[in-house]
Curated annotation (Swiss-Prot):
Residues 450-947 are annotated as: Adenylyl transferase. This is Bifunctional glutamine synthetase adenylyltransferase/adenylyl-removing enzyme. It comes from Salmonella agona (strain SL483). Its cofactor is Mg(2+). Coiled coil: none annotated.
Length: 947
């Protein structure tokens, strides 16, 4: 065993002062001295439990002792009588065994592959032990879940990721998926439950037993987000539901995740075999599938962007050449050829590497280097985490922990360890790039083209000398370009740019200037780009991105030239530069029905319990998607109606995620309202009004929302901290508002306006569905019924959605006096016009002035309220374009008039979108859109001016 280094020997004196009673410096072995100096986690544990230290001193941990974990845990749980004592015993058992593993790992008593096996088997033992105890307890309470034939149904648990692969790290969370075989009901209990309810309750108790922090800590952080539909899906699914999901909706990334899926516990029964057979075709295709290379490349790009965004320096998992790249290399071969080559279907990485070598898919030397690098990185990761039982992959910055790791890795000192690490990661990176890398490089022609601009950038030319490269520009534009370059250089002198940043900037600027200054609008474009560059000059990673990826630079220039709004967004949030790397996605926004799934995948990379990172991730996702929508808008690949569709679907995905996050936080604190125990869903709905309700959002639109619930009076929550059910929903709505409006470094998510709720700002933030119906029928003003025309549920349970739709239909189909309605709608519009219109003398406000968008909206709303009692089909849609179609189809409005209003409406909306992209206000010269305005005014007089 390597003697402790000098810094660690000095630290030992600090450890001596904390030794548990009965132990002295002289009474401890050299092994104990080494472990307790290395790991604060081990030291803290044996201080609390001195008997563990005595046990280790008398007999060292053995390589195969993982075979005894199940028996040891069974003994520990023998006296457990309730959930609280179960939680305590699970936590103590986990800590005791983790100390033994840390001891064996630190002293190299067991090889690194076996350490991974021990860590994984410990987690599996605790999961299965907790499940089995709780299953029996739930059966005593509610009966045994059975299928229609009376066969008892088990809870099957899929361990995902490193747990499934038997490669768990020291301080890891665990990714699980719960399933049960067949539908049915419980039998033999005090009351019957259907199987879905039984397994949901069992799953909730199991997660609590493992995940909830107590005075004894927690067992594992449990992450359930890999299950079908993520947090918005059922906690536990039947086999049939799982099969349907993976056959019909399973995504590529879910297929990759399923490669490592493994059933926990003794799993050779018929149900387990059925589940494995059902999942296998989804994971491994019968044919050779090369499409996975691009998918994995995209996933790697997402991870690289995350590293940049979160500033993850020295990360041995996610960094270039890190653990994740080795996993990606192996997965490429598994997913391309695994359907044909059974030897590639192993869940574990090292056996799969052996199979890759045996099949000659990689050179032997590459495989050998990957194996050595993997074991080196995994040992370093586990040692790093065992210092404080902390989930981290970032190398330490302090001298003590650096000395610990150098000693644990058998290096002379920290620089030697860093040198070895650098060599291993370089080997991994080389293989990765050869297999699925996509690095770009400059061509000789590009170098030659940018050479004259190198002198311009380095200020070696006088103004007259620069004339040849700027000959196509007018004199004033030429002077402006040179002034912008000079001013930018002066600005850089004020910035603390390191040598590497200067070097990258000097490589980048000649190429950037060559591209920008070849344009006729060079001065304008450069004036938009230099603020962005000034914002990132101290962040070398973003300069390197633009320097190393010429394609990204070209897209940056094109987009900034086309839109100051995009230039401003990129300057404010440089992380968006990552979106420029792939033109295939930059100009092709996410499919309208895929935003929720894309966001779910994006959020999986963020710890569920880290609220700050969750808020940041939501905002970053929104900004990236907005950029892609705007880029497609500029490129002409999205017509105006589609722009609004995308912006609306994006907003709905964000609402869904925010409600999920708020709900999770509330339930963790209070439990859920008890009326939900007997049903699926959350008893909650979010209704979108205005532009959101009408699928007509713009780039900077706020969200008009109201919140509904269906909680009866006198219902309490079922958590440890009980509160009134209606109070729960009020706090939920407040939490949602907070998550939307909290300002992070990435700004706010959306401005949310909830004043359209019953009684406006004076009313309750969340309303019961019954109270909402009563208010609409007896108290609401006509303008509130107008607003209801453009309202729809954007998040909610099916039954609440149906209830809202019924109320909306009932209100809209109520017979009204035509003259009274006409007067009230017209007077409301006149009030709005007096308040909002004609603010810009000699200008036309596209939205608020006569003949503008609001007039068209009022015409549509008036006609729906006026005629829906005769033509109930008019209530079907909430957007103006389809309402105008319905008016024509139902004989209310002449088809020619409806089409003309639709064209006018989309033309004006298109102009508003483009003004927003140019960061211009929504008004134009009075001479603009005279044809459209005249048409709208004529229609207004026809329908809303009293005869």
């Amino acid at each position: 065993m390597t003697p402790l280094s000098s810094p660690l020997s000095q630290y030992w004196q600090t450890v001596v002062e904390r030794l548990p009673e009965g132990f002295t410096e002289t009474s401890l072995s050299v092994q104990a001295k080494s472990v307790l100096t290395f790991s604060d986690f081990a030291l803290d544990s044996v201080i609390a439990h001195p008997e563990w230290l005595a046990e280790l001193e008398s007999a060292s941990p053995q390589a195969d002792e993982w075979r005894h974990y199940a028996g040891w845990l069974q003994e520990a749980l023998a006296g457990v009588c309730d959930d609280a004592s179960l939680m305590r015993e699970l936590r103590l058992f986990r800590r005791r065994i983790m100390v033994r593993i840390a001891w064996a790992q630190t002293l190299s008593l067991v090889d690194d592959e076996t350490i991974l096996q021990q860590l994984s088997h410990l987690a599996e033992t605790l999961i299965v032990g907790a499940r089995d105890w709780l299953y029996a307890a739930c059966c005593r309470e509610w009966g045994t879940p059975c299928n229609p034939q009376g066969v008892p149904q088990p809870l099957l648990i899929l361990g995902m990721g490193k747990l499934g692969g038997g490669e768990l790290n020291f301080s890891s969370d665990i990714d699980l998926i719960f399933a049960w075989p067949e539908h049915g009901e419980t039998r033999g209990g005090r009351r019957e439950l259907d199987n879905a309810q039984f397994f949901t309750r069992l799953g909730q108790r199991l997660i609590k037993a493992l995940d909830q922090p107590t005075m004894d800590g927690f067992v594992y952080r449990v992450d359930m987000r890999l299950r079908p539909f993520g947090d918005s899906g059922p906690l536990v699914l039947s086999f049939a539901a799982l099969e349907d999901y993976y056959q019909e909706q399973g995504r590529d990334w879910e297929r990759y995740a399923m490669v490592k899926a493994r059933l926990m516990g003794d799993n050779d029964d018929a149900w387990s075999r059925e589940l494995r057979a059902m999942l296998r075709p989804f994971v491994f295709r019968r044919y050779i599938d090369f499409s996975v290379i691009q998918s994995l490349r995209n996933m790697k790009g997402m991870i690289a962007r995350e590293v940049r965004r979160r500033g993850l320096k020295d990360n041995i998992k996610l960094g270039a050449g890190g653990i994740r790249e080795i996993e990606f290399i192996v997965q490429v071969f598994q997913l391309i050829r695994g359907g044909r080559e059974p030897s590639l279907q192993s869940r574990s990485l090292l056996p799969t590497l052996d199979a890759i070598a045996a099949l000659h898919l990689l050179p032997e030397n590459d495989v050998a280097q990957l194996r050595v690098a993997y074991l080196f990185l995994r040992r370093l990761e586990n040692l790093l985490q065992s210092i404080n039982d902390e989930q981290t992959q970032t190398l330490p910055a302090d001298d003590l922990n650096r000395a610990r790791l150098a000693w644990g890795m058998k290096a002379e000192n920290w620089p030697q360890l860093v040198g070895e690490l650098t060599d291993h990661m370089a080997n991994v990176r080389r293989v990765f790039n050869e297999l699925i890398g996509d690095d770009e490089a400059d061509t000789p022609q590009e170098e030659e083209r940018s050479e004259p601009w190198r002198e311009v950038w380095q200020d070696a030319l006088q103004e007259d000398d620069s004339t040849p490269v700027l000959a196509h520009l007018a004199d004033e534009d030429r002077r402006q370009v040179l002034t912008l370059i000079a001013d930018f250089r002066k600005e850089l002198d004020k910035r603390p740019i390191g040598p590497r940043g200067r070097q990258v900037l000097d490589q980048l600027m000649p190429h950037l200037l060559a591209d920008v200054c070849s344009r006729e609008d060079a001065a304008v474009t450069l004036s938009r780009i230099t603020p962005l560059l000034a914002g990132i000059v101290t962040r070398t990673t973003y300069l390197e991105l633009l320097s190393e990826f010429p394609g990204a630079l070209k897209h940056l220039i094109m987009l900034c030239a086309a839109s100051p709004m995009i230039a401003s967004q990129l300057a404010r949030y440089p992380l968006l530069l990552d979106e420029l790397l792939d033109p295939g996605t930059l100009y092709q926004p996410t499919a309208t029905d895929a935003y929720r799934d894309e966001l779910r995948q994006y959020l999986l990379r963020v710890p569920e319990e880290d609220e700050e990172q969750q808020l940041e991730a939501l905002r970053q996702f929104k900004q990236a998607q907005l950029l892609r929508i705007a880029a497609a808008d500029i490129a002409g690949t999205l017509p105006v109606m589609k722009v609004s569709d995308h912006l609306t679907w994006l907003a709905e995905a964000m609402i869904d995620a925010v409600v999920q996050q708020a709900w999770t936080q509330m339930v963790a604190r209070y439990g859920q309202p008890a009326h939900l125990d007997e049903r699926q869903g959350r008893g909650f709905a979010v209704v979108g009004y205005g532009k959101l309700g009408g699928w007509e959002l713009g780039y900077s639109s706020d969200l008009d929302l109201i919140f509904l619930h269906d909680c009866p009076m006198d219902v309490m929550t079922n958590g440890e901290r009980e509160i009134d059910g209606r109070q729960f929903y009020l706090r939920l709505a407040q939490r949602i508002m907070h998550l939307f409006s909290t300002r992070t470094s990435s700004g706010i998510l959306y401005e949310v306006d909830a004043r359209l709720r019953p009684s406006g700002a004076a009313g309750m933030l969340v309303t019961s569905a019954d109270a909402f119906a009563d208010y609409q029928q007896h108290e609401a003003w006509t303008w509130e019924h107008q607003a209801l025309v453009r309202a729809r549920v954007v998040y909610g349970d099916p039954q609440l959605t149906s209830q809202f739709d019924t109320v909306r239909r009932t209100i809209m189909t109520t017979a009204r006096d035509g003259k009274t309605l006409q007067t009230e709608v017209r007077e409301m519009r006149e009030k709005m016009r007096a308040h909002l219109g004609n603010k810009h003398r000699d200008r036309f406000d596209i939205k608020a002035d006569e003949g503008g968008i609001t007039d068209i909206e009022f015409i549509a709303q008036y006609l729906v309220l006026r005629y829906a009692h005769e033509k109930p089909k008019l209530t079907r849609w909430s957007d103006n374009v389809r309402i105008l179609e319905l008016l024509a189809q139902n004989g209310i409005m002449d088809e020619h008039e409806a089409q003309a209003l639709t064209v006018a409406y989309t033309t004006l909306r298109d102009e508003l979108h483009h003004l927003a992209l140019q960061e211009l206000p929504g008004h134009v010269a009075q001479t603009c859109f005279s044809k459209e305005r005249a048409l709208v005014q004529a229609s207004w007089r026809k329908w809303l001016v009293a005869v």
